[in-house]
Amino acid sequence: PLLSNKESEFLGILSRNIIPDYSVFPKIRLIEFVRPHGSEEAVKELIREVQNITCDFVLKSYDETVLAVIQFGETATVRQQKKKLIIQRVCAMTEISFFEFKNTVDMMGSEDFCQFLRDDEE
């Protein structure tokens, strides 16, 4: 699926602000980055659940730090809300940093996000 104009703009701002330290992957399945370990049913269930969940943007730094960035407009559908919760859960289990922004202004104004990027550079 091609990116919408808003997403392309978001990607552009992400790229200008964090490249060359990170690779940015738009519209990518989280499972491609996340391989939850463990044989217990809960983990298997999680993998099944997350197989087809696409994160809006996944950033990956050279030292393999991964953060999932999800961008929804003001009104997220029920399905999007559920998707967000699943992504958050996967991130929590796999020590991926998760950020959610309504728009690029929101992102650039996020102290946590900027701090995360700065910490990662040190």
Where are these regions (language model features)?
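N-terminal topogenic membrane-targeting module
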Residues: 1-40
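Active-site-adjacent loop/helix micro-motif of nuclease/hydrolase catalytic cores
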Residues: 50, 77-84, 109
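Active-site metal-binding core of divalent-cation-utilizing nuclease and nuclease-like domains
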Residues: 26-63
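Short, well-structured secondary-structure segments
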Residues: 23-29, 68-69, 97-100
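Short histidine/acidic/glycine/proline-rich micro-motifs that form metal-
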Residues: 1, 74-78, 104-105
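Basic, glycine-rich
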Residues: 95-122
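Arginine/glycine-rich "motif VI" loop of SF2 helicases in the C-terminal RecA-like domain
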Residues: 62-64, 89-97
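Conserved catalytic cores of phosphodiester-cleaving nucleases, focusing on short active-site segments
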Residues: 14, 55-59, 68-74, 91
